[in-house]
Swiss-Prot record:
It is a multi-pass membrane protein. Residues 1-16, 70-77, 129-138, 182-224, 283-288, 334-357, 400-407 are cytoplasmic. One of its GO terms (cellular component) is plasma membrane. One of its GO terms (biological process) is carboxylic acid transport. SUPFAM superfamilies: MFS general substrate transporter (SSF103473). Pfam families: MFS_1. Keywords: Cell inner membrane, Cell membrane, Membrane, Transmembrane, Transmembrane helix, Transport. InterPro entries: MFS, MFS_dom, MFS_trans_sf, Sugar_transporter_CS. PROSITE patterns: MFS. Residues 38-48, 99-107, 160, 246-261, 310-312 are periplasmic. It is found in: Cell inner membrane. Belongs to the major facilitator superfamily. Aromatic acid:H(+) symporter (AAHS) (TC 2.A.1.15) family. This is Putative metabolite transport protein HI_1104.
C-alpha cells in the first residue's frame, strides 16, 4: 500500500468520524434534556437517569453484536444497518408518550450507536496506509468531541424553542449525513480479499471465529487484557471527571451555568487537541511511548488539578486536564487494528472498547461515593491511581505495533 492517502481513505474516515460524532452528540443532548423530559413525562430522578444507563447498555450490546456482524458481512454494509436503526428509534423518541416506550426507543437507538466506534475505526484503519494509521484513528476519535461540542452549543439555543421532542429530531440529522457519505463507499480491499478466502466457512464454530481470535493464544490474550485495562481506565476517568466536575464547579465554587458551560467547552477543546496530538505523536515515536507519555501526563495533571482552588485557573487548567485524560482516545483504533486480523478487527474494536465503556460507567458512582465520604479534591486525586495502573498495563501487556502490515 502506498503512503499517500487516496480519496477513498478520506471518504471512509469522514463517514466514520461523522457517525462517531453522532454518538457523542446524542448522549450529550440527552443529558441536557433530562430535566425537560422528566418534567413533561412525570419521571422520577431514577427513571430519568435510567434513560442514560439503558442507552449505554444498548450501546455495549450493539457494539458486540455489530462488531461481529461487520467482520462477517462488511464494514460499510453493517454501518448502514446501525445508522438506520439509530435514526428510526431516535425519531420514535420524539413521539414517546411515557417512560416505558421512551426507554425502549432509547435502548434500541443505543444498540445502533454501539456499532459506530469499532466498525468506523476498523474501516478507517483498513483504508489508510500504515504510516498514517494512528492519525486516521485520532481523526475518527475527534468526531466524538465535535459531536459533544456541537451538542453543548446547540442544545441551549434550540431546546427552549423546539422542546425535547424537536431536539430528538435534530439528533437524526447527523445520521442522515453519515448515511449519505457511506452510501458512496465500497468495502475496503483488504476486507474483500479476506472475505473471499473465508467464504467457505459456515459451521457454528467458524461463525464464532472473530471472538475466538481475541484469545487465540497466550500473546493475543495478553494484548486483549491490556487493551481492556486501557479502555476501562479511559472511560472510567472520562466519565468520572466529566460528570462530576461541572457539578463541583457550580456548587462549591459558584460557577454560573454559563461559566460551567464555558469550562466544559474549554475542557473539550483540550481533549480535541490531545486526541490530535496523540495521533501525530503515535505515528512518529510509536504507540507504546505515546500511551506512556499521556498516562504520565494524566497522573501529573490530575494531581495538580486536585490542588487548585482559584476558579479562573481551574477554568483554564481544564484544557490541560482534558488533553491528557482523554487524548489517548486517539490511539486505541490504530492499536487494535494492528493487534488483530481482518476477520476479527471490528469485533476487537467494539468488544474491547465496550467492555471498557461498561467498566467506565462505574466512574461517576465511585467518584460520587468518595466525594460523600471525603471531598471532591480527594476523589479527583485518587483517580490518578488508575492511570498508574494504566502505565503498568502498557509496560507489561502492550507490544509496539507501529507500522505493522494489516493481515
Amino acid at each position: 500500500m502506498t503512503n499517500k492517502v487516496n480519496s477513498y481513505g478520506w471518504k471512509a474516515l469522514i463517514g466514520s468520524a461523522v457517525g462517531y460524532g453522532m454518538d457523542g452528540f446524542d448522549l450529550l443532548i440527552l443529558g441536557f434534556m433530562l430535566s425537560a423530559i422528566s418534567a413533561d413525562l412525570n419521571l422520577t430522578p431514577a427513571q430519568g437517569g435510567s434513560l442514560v444507563t439503558w442507552t449505554l447498555i444498548g450501546a455495549v450490546f450493539g457494539g458486540i453484536l455489530f462488531g461481529a456482524l461487520s467482520d462477517k458481512y462488511g464494514r460499510v454494509r453493517v454501518l448502514t444497518w446501525t445508522i438506520l436503526l439509530f435514526a428510526v428509534f431516535t425519531g420514535l423518541c420524539a413521539i414517546a408518550q411515557g417512560y416505558w416506550d421512551l426507554l425502549i426507543y432509547r435502548t434500541i437507538a443505543g444498540i445502533g450507536l454501539g456499532g459506530e466506534f469499532g466498525i468506523g475505526m476498523a474501516l478507517a484503519a483498513e483504508a489508510w496506509p500504515a504510516r498514517h494509521r494512528a492519525k486516521a484513528a485520532s481523526y475518527v476519535a475527534l468526531g466524538w468531541q465535535v459531536g459533544v461540542l456541537g451538542a453543548a452549543l446547540l442544545t441551549p439555543l434550540l431546546l427552549p424553542h423546539i422542546g425535547w421532542r424537536g431536539m430528538f429530531l435534530v439528533g437524526i440529522f447527523p445520521a442522515f449525513v453519515a448515511w449519505f457519505l457511506r452510501s458512496h463507499l465500497h468495502e475496503p480491499e483488504i476486507f474483500t480479499q479476506k472475505q473471499t478466502a473465508l467464504s467457505t466457512q459456515s459451521s457454528f464454530t467458524d461463525k464464532l471465529r472473530s471472538f475466538q481470535l481475541l484469545i487465540k493464544d497466550k500473546a493475543t490474550s495478553k494484548i486483549s487484557l491490556g487493551i481492556v485495562v486501557l479502555t476501562s481506565v479511559q472511560n472510567f476517568g472520562y466519565y468520572g471527571i466529566m460528570i462530576w466536575l461541572p457539578n463541583f464547579l457550580s456548587k462549591q465554587l459558584g460557577f454560573s451555568l454559563t461559566k460551567s458551560g464555558l469550562w466544559t467547552a474549554v475542557t473539550v477543546c483540550g481533549m480535541m487537541a490531545g486526541i490530535w496530538i496523540f495521533g501525530q505523536l503515535a505515528d512518529r515515536i510509536g504507540r507504546k511511548p505515546s500511551f506512556l507519555l499521556f498516562q504520565l501526563g494524566a497522573v501529573i495533571s490530575i494531581v495538580v488539578y486536585s490542588q487548585l482552588t482559584d476558579p479562573d485557573i481551574m477554568l483554564l487548567a481544564g484544557a490541560f486536564l482534558g488533553m491528557f485524560v482523554n487524548g489517548m482516545l486517539g490511539g486505541y483504533g490504530a492499536l487494535m487494528a494492528e493487534a488483530y486480523p481482518t476477520e476479527a478487527r471490528a469485533t476487537a474494536q467494539n468488544v474491547l472498547f465496550n467492555i471498557g465503556r461498561a467498566v467506565g460507567g462505574f466512574g461517576p458512582v465511585v467518584v460520587g461515593s468518595v466525594v460523600l465520604a471525603y471531598s471532591f479534591q480527594t476523589a479527583i486525586a485518587l483517580l490518578a491511581i488508575i492511570y498508574v495502573i494504566d502505565m503498568l498495563a502498557t509496560i507489561f501487556l502492550i507490544p509496539e505495533l507501529k507500522g505493522k502490515a494489516l493481515d
